[in-house]
């Protein structure tokens, strides 16, 4: 078994900002490229397939469990809800962030072979604004970061947003590619 560890780059800063009445704690990090194997689908305003994709991935997880990158303690490094535009260029979703590709999956090594019925994405190394979320705060935090915090910091969204769950802690985070 190969053991992996996510190595974040240097933190530029970790700060709090009040945006839209919500206190948002965030940090800016550099993250190496990320490989994910999961179930892929197209989301639109008319049909959000995110929950269906997670259901498919979870129901068939035994197919890929041995492929997932693990920490030294045997826990998985992380589960990603990765997003991309329809060209798979990892640009932001279109149609007011309602249309794009979504991949529900587990982080793997880049050279991992993809089993039949699964898809692998390799997201390029980037700078991210990262903030912790809860299921209840997801929508409001997403909108506040996109519409207020990123512009307030003099930055711009540079790609599709991804959500991340760290199984060891149960912590959920949003990763906003910025420049």
For each feature predicted by the language model, list its residue ranges.
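A solvent-exposed interaction/effector surface
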Residues: 4, 8-179
């Amino acid at each position: 078994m190969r053991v992996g560890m996510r190595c974040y780059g240097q933190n530029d800063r970790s700060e709090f900002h009040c945006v839209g009445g919500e206190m948002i704690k965030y940090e800016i990090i550099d993250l190496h490229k990320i490989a994910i194997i999961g179930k892929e689908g197209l989301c639109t305003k008319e049909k959000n397939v995110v929950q269906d994709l997670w259901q498919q991935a979870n129901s068939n997880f035994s197919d890929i469990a041995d492929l997932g990158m693990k920490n030294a303690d045997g826990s998985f490094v992380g589960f990603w809800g990765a997003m991309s535009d329809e060209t798979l260029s990892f640009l932001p979703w279109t149609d007011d962030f309602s249309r794009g590709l979504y991949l529900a999956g587990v982080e793997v090594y880049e050279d991992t072979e993809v089993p039949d019925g699964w898809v692998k994405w390799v997201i390029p190394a980037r700078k991210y604004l990262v903030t912790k979320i809860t299921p209840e705060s997801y929508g409001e935090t997403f909108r506040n970061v996109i519409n207020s915090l990123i512009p307030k910091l003099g930055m711009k969204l540079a790609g599709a947003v991804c959500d991340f769950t760290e199984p060891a802690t149960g912590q959920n985070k949003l990763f906003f590619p910025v420049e």
